[in-house]
Amino acid sequence: MSVILLLLNSIGFIVPVLLAVALLTLIERKVLGYMQLRKGPNIVGPYGLLQPIADGFKLIIKETLKPSNASPYLFYLSPVLFFFLSILLWSIIPVINSTLNFNLSLILILGLSSLSVYSLLGSGWSSNSNYSFLGGVRAVAQTISYEISLGLILLSVVVFSGGFNIGLISSVQNECWLAVCCFPLFSIWFISTLAETNRAPFDLTEGESSNSFQGTMLNIPGGPFALFFIAEYANIIFMNLFSVLLFLGGGSPVNLLFPINIISVIFKTVALVVLFLWIRASYPRFRYDQLMYLTWKKYLPLSLGLLIFFKFLLSLNKDYLQDY
């Protein structure tokens, strides 16, 4: 019976994630269209609402072709692993009932997000293409570089909240959000999440010019590409939801009023997602050396300095140290 309940719980959060990804693809094209003074998708269904279904059907019916010199197993295993890790991250978020809700959930999220680089590198290497391999190396270097800054920012959040549990971190922000109290920390976190999810202006791994078109997914056919695509957009929604829980107080100021607290979380997440799209429509792509310069010479020293500064300020409060 417990296995059946666990299976139903898993399906209960997988289906909404897939629906949210489909809706995000439509919202992205609509928002970018209106920002560029055009309508976006408006043919398939009323007002283009069925466009995600048409896109998914198109990818599914495409023939799955494998390059003749590609690795026979890793070529198909990498997209599945990337999709599985992306969906597994959602089981930790305690929105209603978390499948894996425990005290060290922050560490688990950081570890699972780090594992995705293996699927990206494996996908680039297994296709036996120089362009795909270079795109995979770029993706790995970018992800690892910005994860260091994200890890230091998470340590600062832990210092403020006194624990590694996501529910605890959200509950301590009832009076003041960390995004307000520590705005420099939140700004570094938000920009780093753009780089972590390979979004503009940090989407160098999927450059649309001749430098590395589609990057590691250059030779990926329709079905496996759909897994990469779904996982990438699921990561975008997840990182914004994670930002809401860490810095915007989750469902506060109505944490105890169900379902208003869920609506509050969804509203904040959608606002951050639209901000992602707004940045994509407004800013040009960084050069790769500028991307690395930003994280290693700007964000890493700044996030480390803020961590030491916040720890020093809180160490002056002896009552806090006793509770901690």
Curated annotation (Swiss-Prot):
<dbReference type="GO" id="GO:0005743">
    <property type="term" value="C:mitochondrial inner membrane"/>
</dbReference>
<feature type="transmembrane region" description="Helical">
    <location>
        <begin position="76"/>
        <end position="96"/>
    </location>
</feature>
<keyword id="KW-0999">Mitochondrion inner membrane</keyword>
<keyword id="KW-0249">Electron transport</keyword>
<feature type="transmembrane region" description="Helical">
    <location>
        <begin position="175"/>
        <end position="195"/>
    </location>
</feature>
<dbReference type="InterPro" id="IPR001694">
    <property type="entry name" value="NADH_UbQ_OxRdtase_su1/FPO"/>
</dbReference>
<keyword id="KW-0496">Mitochondrion</keyword>
<comment type="similarity">
    <text>Belongs to the complex I subunit 1 family.</text>
</comment>
<feature type="transmembrane region" description="Helical">
    <location>
        <begin position="256"/>
        <end position="276"/>
    </location>
</feature>
<keyword id="KW-0472">Membrane</keyword>
<feature type="transmembrane region" description="Helical">
    <location>
        <begin position="227"/>
        <end position="247"/>
    </location>
</feature>
<keyword id="KW-1278">Translocase</keyword>
<keyword id="KW-0813">Transport</keyword>
<feature type="transmembrane region" description="Helical">
    <location>
        <begin position="294"/>
        <end position="314"/>
    </location>
</feature>
<feature type="transmembrane region" description="Helical">
    <location>
        <begin position="148"/>
        <end position="168"/>
    </location>
</feature>
<dbReference type="Pfam" id="PF00146">
    <property type="entry name" value="NADHdh"/>
</dbReference>
<dbReference type="InterPro" id="IPR018086">
    <property type="entry name" value="NADH_UbQ_OxRdtase_su1_CS"/>
</dbReference>
<keyword id="KW-0830">Ubiquinone</keyword>
<keyword id="KW-0812">Transmembrane</keyword>
<keyword id="KW-1133">Transmembrane helix</keyword>
<protein>
    <recommendedName>
        <fullName>NADH-ubiquinone oxidoreductase chain 1</fullName>
        <ecNumber>7.1.1.2</ecNumber>
    </recommendedName>
</protein>
<feature type="transmembrane region" description="Helical">
    <location>
        <begin position="3"/>
        <end position="23"/>
    </location>
</feature>
<dbReference type="GO" id="GO:0009060">
    <property type="term" value="P:aerobic respiration"/>
</dbReference>
<dbReference type="GO" id="GO:0008137">
    <property type="term" value="F:NADH dehydrogenase (ubiquinone) activity"/>
</dbReference>
<feature type="transmembrane region" description="Helical">
    <location>
        <begin position="102"/>
        <end position="122"/>
    </location>
</feature>
<keyword id="KW-0679">Respiratory chain</keyword>
<comment type="function">
    <text>Core subunit of the mitochondrial membrane respiratory chain NADH dehydrogenase (Complex I) that is believed to belong to the minimal assembly required for catalysis. Complex I functions in the transfer of electrons from NADH to the respiratory chain. The immediate electron acceptor for the enzyme is believed to be ubiquinone.</text>
</comment>
<keyword id="KW-0520">NAD</keyword>
